[in-house]
């Protein structure tokens, strides 16, 4: 049965963090959008830890907000603890993080989706895609209903042939309590998309009243919280009643009545239990084939890979105001349940803990992201976009950032418009996508500030300034907000010029600020500016030398970054190009010389050969009239 007589502009398959941002972004730029999910009651569920942000991830969330996404606002409104990480270090590596009320976060997102114009929700499990040659035109569902669309965004998370492990026990599913998407993998493979297996895991959940917090160290939120959204949600009554368990009208404004997290450590007994039972672990017992995340290791990995460490830090994180459930951050495991009980009880403060949910590992299919264009469209299937964990990433924030870009580009593809592509110097989202597409990943990819070579320019406070032209060009923000950002940008640049030019007997005001490390007395007019303006002005003045050096480096890189490679180039017929490089370039088909230079195995000499051929117009062409990635031949 066909659901719609006229095709949707965009169909999004999956309503996790990538799917939500994809569907909202597409709808907000005016595309008639359908969001399909197997269960409308789990839209936006925080499957693992109840937190948003953290190192580099906080910057991604602010970039999502700067581009009109929802994650930042949703976090501010449903957050129950806010902290600025690395606050004693420079602004380039400072990152906001928040604990969220898990259910409130989910419910508010669903409510936002329901109210969004141009967006329709429907509960059905996607079982396969519908193709017309090398182009996707819709999808099939378990209800025997077919949905047709101009573009399709697949955001399946851990559900593609998801298999959960607790010791030797196995159950199909992408998350405890939910089924897996079993047949969609076959549909993708039939279209020529390669799939591999990754693994992730989650720790047990505990009953709060069974914990002894007197044996743990308290971790409070910041007295002056750093929020994620640039627009202060408190100004327009940004409250959401569901999470608070109070009568309507008594909801808690963002940042107020914050809750605490708690810290404890593993013991020698914990280590002994892990080592004694390694063979019963699904991971170490050979039950799991997929590669797990390096930067979020299981407790088994911690005691094997870091055997010299006598103990490991654990965080007890509350899952909400209206629940007594706690998440044990750092205790992910695939050990059997009887061992899990002993592990938990070996930890200070958890000796009498009651387990509400077991820890488990989940194995799932992902598509190596080198099969994508920078727009996140498949090279093989026209109109098919992939975002989130299907691209090999881990984390809500990485998924949401990809989802927003995929949603915008799916809408733009349907209109015949150029895609939105963020540069590495413009956004962490740009670094993320460029890394995935040009380098690929052999393990679940997590973003860090160290991955961004231009991180000095990517501080969390500047996101809406550096992405203003993209937000404006894509019509992702309303006119009032765009005007406000433009005025803020002008004010910052004006104040930087003034401080660099106004002189006193001790030098310019900027020189005095740099000499006194921001302790200098600032002009009263500047002090009357908003804190975000003051902070950005001081940051640019204090680090002006580094800032200018970065800009010069970016300008130099732009000389090759902007050079487009002909779509029909035949790398295997280029004289002097090493065969290893030719094969990798032919497989990934980068759009620009800059992308080509970042592909593993391609060296500067290879790039120089390409540069000369492109500039002289002597690049050999493929014999066919179209490239293998579906791009039209110029």
UniProtKB/Swiss-Prot annotation:
What SMART domains does this protein map onto?
A: GIDA_assoc_3 (SM01228)
| GO annotation, cellular component aspect | cytosol
Q: Which InterPro entries match?
A: FAD/NAD-bd_sf, MnmG, MnmG-rel, MnmG-rel_CS, MnmG_C, MnmG_C_subdom, MnmG_C_subdom_sf, MnmG_N
Gene3D superfamilies cross-referenced by the UniProt entry: FAD/NAD(P)-binding domain (3.50.50.60), GidA associated domain, C-terminal subdomain (1.10.150.570)
Query: Main localisation, per the record?
Result: cytoplasm
What GO MF terms are annotated? Answer: flavin adenine dinucleotide binding
- Report the record's Gene Ontology biological process terms: tRNA methylation; tRNA wobble uridine modification
Subcellular localization, as worded in the UniProt entry: Cytoplasm
| Cofactor(s) listed in the protein's UniProt record | FAD
| Residue numbers binding NAD(+) | 292-306
Keyword terms: Cytoplasm, FAD, Flavoprotein, NAD, tRNA processing
Please state which protein family the record places this protein in.
Belongs to the MnmG family.
PANTHER family with a match to the protein in the record:
GLUCOSE INHIBITED DIVISION PROTEIN A, PROTEIN MTO1 HOMOLOG, MITOCHONDRIAL
What function is annotated for this protein? NAD-binding protein involved in the addition of a carboxymethylaminomethyl (cmnm) group at the wobble position (U34) of certain tRNAs, forming tRNA-cmnm(5)s(2)U34.
Kindly state the subunit structure of this protein. Homodimer. Heterotetramer of two MnmE and two MnmG subunits.
Q: What is this protein called?
A: tRNA uridine 5-carboxymethylaminomethyl modification enzyme MnmG
Provenance organism: Opitutus terrae (strain DSM 11246 / JCM 15787 / PB90-1)
Q: Which gene encodes it?
A: mnmG
């Amino acid at each position: 049965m066909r659901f719609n007589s006229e095709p949707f502009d965009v169909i999004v398959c999956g309503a996790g963090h990538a799917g939500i941002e994809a569907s909202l972004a597409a709808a907000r730029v005016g595309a008639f959008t359908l969001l399909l999910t197997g269960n409308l009651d789990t839209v936006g569920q925080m499957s693992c830890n109840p937190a948003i942000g953290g190192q580099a991830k906080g910057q991604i969330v602010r970039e999502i907000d700067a581009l009109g996404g929802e994650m930042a606002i949703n976090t501010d409104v449903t957050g129950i603890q806010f902290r600025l990480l690395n606050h004693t270090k420079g602004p380039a590596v400072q990152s906001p993080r928040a604990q969220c009320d898990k259910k409130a976060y989910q419910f508010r997102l669903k409510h936002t989706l329901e109210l969004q114009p141009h967006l329709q929700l429907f509960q059905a499990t996607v079982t396969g895609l519908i193709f017309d040659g090398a182009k996707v035109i819709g999808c099939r569902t378990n209800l025997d209903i077919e949905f047709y669309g101009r573009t399709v965004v697949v955001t399946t998370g851990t559900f593609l042939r998801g298999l959960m492990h607790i010791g030797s026990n196995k159950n199909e599913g992408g998350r405890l309590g939910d089924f897996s998407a079993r047949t969609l993998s076959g549909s993708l493979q039939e279209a020529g998309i390669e799939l591999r297996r990754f693994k992730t895991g989650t720790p047990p959940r505990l009953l709060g009243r069974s914990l002894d917090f007197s044996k743990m160290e308290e971790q409070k939120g910041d007295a002056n919280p750093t929020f994620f959204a640039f627009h202060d949600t408190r100004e327009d009554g940004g409250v959401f009643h569901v999470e608070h368990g109070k009568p309507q009208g008594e909801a808690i404004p963002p940042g107020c009545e914050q809750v605490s997290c708690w810290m404890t450590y593993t013991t020698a007994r914990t280590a002994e239990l892990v080592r004694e039972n390694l063979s019963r672990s699904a991971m170490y017992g050979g039950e799991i084939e997929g590669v797990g995340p390096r930067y979020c290791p299981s407790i088994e990995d911690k005691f094997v890979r870091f055997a010299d460490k006598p103990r490991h830090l654990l965080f007890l994180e509350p899952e909400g105001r209206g629940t007594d459930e706690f998440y044990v951050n750092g205790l992910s495991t695939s050990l059997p349940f009887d061992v899990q009980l002993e592990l938990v009880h070996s930890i200070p403060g958890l000796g009498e803990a009651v387990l509400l949910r077991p820890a488990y590992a989940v194995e799932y299919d992902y598509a190596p992201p080198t099969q994508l264009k920078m727009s996140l469209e498949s090279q093989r299937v026209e109109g098919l976009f992939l975002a989130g964990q299907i691209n090999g990433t881990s984390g809500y924030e990485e998924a949401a950032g990809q989802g927003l870009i995929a949603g915008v580009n799916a809408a733009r593809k349907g209109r015949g418009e150029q895609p939105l592509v963020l540069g590495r110097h413009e956004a962490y989202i740009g670094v993320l996508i460029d890394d995935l597409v040009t380098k690929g990943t052999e393990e679940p990819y997590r973003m860090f500030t160290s991955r961004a070579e231009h991180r000095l320019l990517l501080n969390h406070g500047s996101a809406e300034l550096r992405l203003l032209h993209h937000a404006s060009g894509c019509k992702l923000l309303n006119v009032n907000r765009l005007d406000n950002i433009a005025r803020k940008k002008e004010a910052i640049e004006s104040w930087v010029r003034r401080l660099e030019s106004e002189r006193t007997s001790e030098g310019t005001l900027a020189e005095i600020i740099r000499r006194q490390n921001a302790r200098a007395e600032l002009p009263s007019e500047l002090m009357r500016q908003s804190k975000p303006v003051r902070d950005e002005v001081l940051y640019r003045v204090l680090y002006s030398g580094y800032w200018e050096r970065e800009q010069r480096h970016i300008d130099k890189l732009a000389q090759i970054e902007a050079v487009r490679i002909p779509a029909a180039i035949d790398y295997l017929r280029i004289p002097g190009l090493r065969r290893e490089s030719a094969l990798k370039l032919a497989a990934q088909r980068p759009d620009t010389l800059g992308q080509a230079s970042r592909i593993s195995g391609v060296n500067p000499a290879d790039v120089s050969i390409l540069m000369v051929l492109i500039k002289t117009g002597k690049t050999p062409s493929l014999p066919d009239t179209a490239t293998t990635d579906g791009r039209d031949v110029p």
